[in-house]
């Protein structure tokens, strides 16, 4: 009733008023709220019957879990809608949205109180937990994670000096140049307060330069918010603080986390030495360092979303549960950031079909899971890209993407290209792979190892998913993209490179090969690893000395 009073508290504009000074929308909203109040009143008169019905319904504990999940999702969408009622959601909806937020929030609170025993149970926690409890992690996995943490911290420390380059002041930054100098003013505009709350939201979410998706600017904004609060009006000029934080927080740390995800995919952290060597192999690839030294860009974040998608698909193990839909969220974030998530389509399709063929799911269940996956992915893209809800912003985005797709297909107009690099095809792309990632002998060995794992052992799902992903995105780059930017290849080749020890791991896992064969596989992988690592270290030496 309070929402009804708020809705009718002010008259509509004269141009839209149709009845007693109110617009059709305002009258419809007030009528809907009155109807909701009447229905709620009628339900309260049948509270005993309703309570018994709900008790019977929630006797199946799975329904309690699902109800909490759906109510939480609804509350998130309602809060999002209320926030954006200052931008594109009709302001007249605010009273109704607040009432719904209150109602759904109250329902969640009552559900948590009424079924607190269920929510405190280990079965509930295990049902909703994405990552395992620390106590449930095996000692060897904890040991591996400790080693990886030490290596990662050393890596971050090594990269600090190179990420201070060009950050002394604005003049030094302008000389350093590059994409950062173009993107930085966009971020400063995103973080600039407006004269009104609505104007501030416009700056924050409708940033008008859609070369990169909003998750990139959102993470950058979160990282720099403490600096902005501390430095005040001098904030835009503090490149000595802002740039190192952005480079380390948006480029380096996400890539390191992505490398952890790749290592987990192939070792499950159960092989300390193999895990450590694989992490070093990934982090010291020339392409990784190109991204991690003086380069604030969205590609580290995008790589993290891609690798998390692969991890969640593997953890789901064709059950179509929470991990499968967590993968949908990560795929959506990759799409919202850099569009790469679209290239998961073949891998997801094969994953669904494979579950049916292996009798782990029926066709109707696979179709339902695939449909929900698409819905979750789409909702993630929409909610993480608020500008999509404004027609002018969508038009600007389409214009930019159209222009960018032409550049990707044909190269940057006016650029000096003496080697004729701006062309698609394997002959044009392979030198980029070789210079920044792996030589041909290692490339062939990696694919051979991955395909072996796709047909032998207990990790076939991992290898098939990684192979399909890598093949799809690599084929797109090779045959349709002319620009050879190093960071474009990160999501294609880094997961592939994570399989450097896949051959011996697969042969051991299969349990059908002799000790001599297992030893030969380890020696072969070790030789390829050592040779490629030495070549990469030689390649990256000028970056440090």
Model-predicted regions and their roles:
Residues 39, 301-318, 327-331, 495-499:
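Specific aromatic-rich, kink-prone transmembrane helix
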Residues 162-169, 176-211, 215, 225-233, ...:
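Extracytosolic helix-loop segments that constitute the early lumenal/periplasmic catalytic or substrate-binding loops
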Residues 256-265, 434-463, 473, 500-503:
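Hydrophobic, aromatic-rich transmembrane alpha-helices
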Residues 129-130, 312-322, 331, 343-379, ...:
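Perimembrane helix-loop-helix junctions
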Residues 291-301, 485-486:
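Short acidic/glycine- and proline-prone juxtamembrane loop motifs at membrane-interface regions
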Residues 368-413, 531-543:
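Membrane-lumen/periplasm interface segments of specific transmembrane helices
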Residues 1-2, 64-80, 147-152, 276-283, ...:
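Transmembrane alpha-helix segments characteristic
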Residues 69-75, 149, 329, 350, ...:
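Signature aromatic-anchored transmembrane alpha helix within multi-pass, membrane-resident enzymes
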């Amino acid at each position: 009733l309070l929402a009804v009073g708020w809705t009718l508290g002010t008259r509509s504009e004269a141009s839209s008023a149709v009845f007693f000074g109110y617009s059709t929308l305002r009258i419809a909203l007030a009528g809907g709220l009155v109807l909701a109040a009447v229905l709620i009143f009628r339900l309260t008169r049948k509270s005993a019957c309703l309570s018994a019905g709900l008790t019977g319904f929630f006797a199946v504990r799975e329904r309690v879990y699902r109800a909490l999940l759906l109510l939480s999702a609804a509350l998130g969408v309602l809060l999002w809608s209320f926030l954006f009622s200052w931008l594109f959601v009709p302001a007249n909806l605010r009273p109704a949205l607040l009432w719904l937020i209150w109602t759904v929030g109250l329902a969640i609170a009552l559900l948590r109180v009424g079924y607190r025993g269920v929510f405190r149970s280990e079965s509930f926690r295990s049902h909703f937990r994405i990552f395992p409890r620390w106590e449930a992690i095996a000692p060897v996995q904890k040991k591996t994670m400790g080693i990886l943490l030490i290596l990662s911290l050393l890596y971050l420390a090594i990269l600090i000096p190179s990420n201070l380059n060009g950050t002394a002041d604005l003049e030094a930054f302008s000389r350093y140049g590059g994409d950062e100098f173009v993107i930085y003013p966009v971020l400063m505009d995103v973080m600039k307060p407006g004269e009104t709350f609505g104007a501030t939201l416009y700056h924050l979410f409708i940033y008008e330069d859609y070369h990169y998706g909003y998750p990139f600017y959102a993470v950058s904004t979160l990282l720099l918010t403490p600096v902005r609060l501390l430095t005040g009006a001098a904030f835009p000029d503090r490149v000595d603080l802002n740039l190192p934080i952005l480079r380390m927080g948006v480029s380096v740390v996400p890539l390191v986390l992505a490398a952890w995800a790749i290592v987990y995919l192939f070792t499950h952290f159960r092989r300390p030495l193999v895990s450590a060597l694989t992490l070093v192999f990934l982090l010291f690839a020339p392409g990784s360092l190109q991204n991690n030294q003086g380069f604030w860009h969205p590609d580290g974040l995008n790589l993290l979303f891609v690798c998390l998608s692969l991890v969640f698909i593997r953890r789901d193990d064709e059950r179509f549960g929470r991990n499968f839909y967590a993968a949908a969220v990560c795929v959506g974030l990759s799409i919202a950031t850099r569009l790469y998530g679209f290239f998961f389509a073949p891998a997801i399709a094969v994953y669904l079909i494979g579950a049916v063929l292996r009798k782990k799911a029926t066709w109707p269940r696979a179709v339902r899971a695939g449909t929900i996956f698409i819905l979750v992915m789409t909702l993630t893209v929409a909610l993480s890209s608020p500008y999509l809800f404004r027609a002018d912003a969508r038009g600007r985005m389409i214009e930019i993407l159209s222009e960018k797709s032409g550049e990707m297909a044909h190269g940057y107009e006016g650029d000096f290209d003496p080697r004729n690099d701006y062309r698609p095809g394997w002959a044009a792309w392979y030198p980029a792979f070789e210079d920044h990632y792996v030589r041909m002998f290692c490339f062939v060995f990696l694919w051979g190892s991955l395909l072996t794992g796709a047909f032998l052992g207990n990790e076939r799902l991992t290898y098939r998913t990684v192979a399909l992903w890598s093949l799809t995105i690599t084929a797109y780059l090779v045959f349709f993209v002319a620009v050879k930017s190093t960071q474009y290849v990160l999501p294609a080749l880094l997961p592939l490179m994570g399989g450097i020890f896949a051959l011996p791991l697969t042969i051991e896992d299969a349990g059908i090969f002799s000790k001599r064969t297992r030893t030969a596989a380890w020696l072969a992988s070790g030789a390829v690893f050592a040779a490629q690592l030495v070549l990469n270290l030689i390649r990256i030496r000028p970056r440090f000395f």
